[in-house]
C-alpha cells in the first residue's frame, strides 16, 4: 500500500501520531499495532506481507471509520469537526495509506472498481444516488448522512427489522466497489 508519512510521534504518547492535513491543519490519530511495527523490523520477515493482509487492511478501514462515529454531518467536510459521506470514505482509506477520490459514484479511472453488490465485504464501498457508505458486513453500513433523524456519521442497516434500518437506502443501493 502507499503509506503516507506522518509529522512526528506525539510527545509522551507513543501510541499516537500527527498527520499534516490540508491548510496546515494537524490530525492526531492512534497508531494501530500494525503501524507500530517499523519498516526495519519488517525487513527479512517472511510474514511481513501477512501483517498487512487484506483482512487486516479491511479491519483497519472500519476502525478508522468508527473513529468518526457521531461526528456531525458537514457537506464537503473531512475532519472530526464535520464530515460528509465521501469525506468519511476518503479519510478512512487515506489514513490507511490509500488515496481514493472524494466521489459518490464509480467513474472511469476511479481507484475503486465495481463489484457485484452481493460480493461486498467489510471495508468495501456501497454507492447510492449521490451518496457513498462503507460496508460493515451483515447488511450494515457506516456513513456520513444529513438525514433528518441522524445528521452525523452513523451506522444503519439495509436489512428490514434490524436496528437502524433505512428502507430508503435499501431501495436505492445501486453499486458496490472495492480496491481488491
Give the location of each predicted region:
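A structural motif
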Residues: 54-64
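Short, well-ordered loop/turn sites that connect or cap secondary structure elements
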Residues: 120, 126-127
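Aromatic- and glycine-rich peptidoglycan recognition patches
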Residues: 9, 17-19, 23, 27-35, ...
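A conserved glycine-rich beta-strand in the N-terminal activation segment of trypsin-fold
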Residues: 132-133
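Loop/turn positions that initiate beta-strands
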Residues: 25, 39-43, 123
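Catalytic cysteine-centered active-site loop
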Residues: 71-121
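Surface-exposed edge beta-strands and adjoining flexible/disordered loops or tails in beta-rich
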Residues: 5-11
Amino acid at each position: 500500500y502507499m503509506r503516507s508519512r506522518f509529522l512526528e510521534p506525539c510527545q509522551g504518547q507513543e501510541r499516537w501520531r500527527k498527520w499534516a492535513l490540508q491548510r496546515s491543519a494537524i490530525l492526531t490519530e492512534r497508531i494501530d499495532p500494525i503501524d507500530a511495527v517499523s519498516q526495519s523490523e519488517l525487513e527479512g520477515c517472511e510474514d511481513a506481507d501477512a501483517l498487512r493482509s487484506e483482512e487486516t487492511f479491511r479491519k483497519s478501514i472500519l476502525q478508522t471509520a468508527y473513529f468518526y462515529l457521531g461526528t456531525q454531518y458537514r457537506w464537503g467536510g473531512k475532519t472530526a469537526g464535520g464530515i460528509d459521506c465521501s469525506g468519511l470514505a476518503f479519510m478512512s482509506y487515506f489514513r490507511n495509506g490509500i488515496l481514493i477520490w472524494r466521489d459518490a459514484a464509480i467513474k472511469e479511472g476511479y481507484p475503486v472498481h465495481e463489484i457485484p453488490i452481493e460480493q461486498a465485504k467489510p471495508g468495501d464501498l456501497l454507492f447510492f444516488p449521490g451518496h457513498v457508505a462503507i460496508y460493515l458486513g451483515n447488511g450494515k453500513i457506516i456513513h456520513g448522512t444529513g438525514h433528518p433523524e441522524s445528521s452525523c456519521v452513523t451506522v444503519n442497516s439495509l436489512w428490514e427489522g434490524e436496528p437502524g434500518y433505512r428502507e430508503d437506502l435499501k431501495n436505492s443501493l445501486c453499486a458496490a466497489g472495492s480496491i481488491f
